[in-house]
Swiss-Prot record:
Subunit structure of this chain's protein: Homooligomer, may form homodimer. Interacts with p6-gag region of the Pr55 Gag precursor protein through a (Leu-X-X)4 motif near the C-terminus of the P6gag protein. Interacts with host UNG. May interact with host RAD23A/HHR23A. Interacts with host VPRBP/DCAF1, leading to hijack the CUL4A-RBX1-DDB1-DCAF1/VPRBP complex, mediating ubiquitination of host proteins such as TERT and ZGPAT and arrest of the cell cycle in G2 phase.
Predominant location category: virion
Something else known: HIV-1 lineages are divided in three main groups, M (for Major), O (for Outlier), and N (for New, or Non-M, Non-O). The vast majority of strains found worldwide belong to the group M. Group O seems to be endemic to and largely confined to Cameroon and neighboring countries in West Central Africa, where these viruses represent a small minority of HIV-1 strains. The group N is represented by a limited number of isolates from Cameroonian persons. The group M is further subdivided in 9 clades or subtypes (A to D, F to H, J and K).
Cellular localization per UniProt: Virion; Host nucleus; Host extracellular space
Family to which the UniProt record says this protein belongs: Belongs to the HIV-1 VPR protein family.
GO biological process, one term: protein homooligomerization
Organism, as annotated: Human immunodeficiency virus type 1 group M subtype K (isolate 97ZR-EQTB11) (HIV-1)
One family name in Pfam for this protein: VPR
Top-level taxon of origin: Viruses
UniProt key word Phosphoprotein: yes
Region annotation (Homooligomerization) ranges: 1-42
Name of the protein in question: Protein Vpr
Keywords noted in UniProt: Activator, AIDS, Apoptosis, Cell cycle, Host G2/M cell cycle arrest by virus, Host nucleus, Host-virus interaction, Ion channel, Ion transport, Modulation of host cell cycle by virus, Phosphoprotein, Transcription, Transcription regulation, Transport, Viral penetration into host nucleus, Virion, Virus entry into host cell
Length: 96
């Protein structure tokens, strides 16, 4: 008779610690790409609907992931090192 394999992987952090770390990382990235008032309003919306619960944390993580994914998919014009990319002319004639 087959038996389920034993869990031999590395020990994971507790779920709530991992979740908070993910949320903090998403928040840091989100403030680089979206206006703070939008993010504040999103936080208020989540709080009004979920209160101070893990379900609310999971909801805001899901929404931030979706927003960032769409933002990057459409074409983010923010640089990860703080330098905005300049758009070149179509024929490249402005090169020196």
């Amino acid at each position: 008779m087959e038996q389920a394999p034993e869990d031999q992987g590395p020990q994971r952090e507790p779920y709530n610690e991992w979740t908070i770390e993910i949320l903090e990382e998403l928040k840091r990235e989100a403030v680089r790409h979206f206006p703070r008032p939008w993010l504040h309003d999103l936080g208020q919306h989540i709080y009004n609907n979920y209160g101070d619960t893990w379900e609310g944390v999971e909801a805001i993580i899901r929404i931030l992931q979706q927003l960032l994914f769409i933002h990057f998919r459409i074409g983010c014009h923010h640089s990860r090192i703080g330098i905005l990319r300049q758009r070149r002319g179509g024929n490249g004639a402005s090169r020196s």
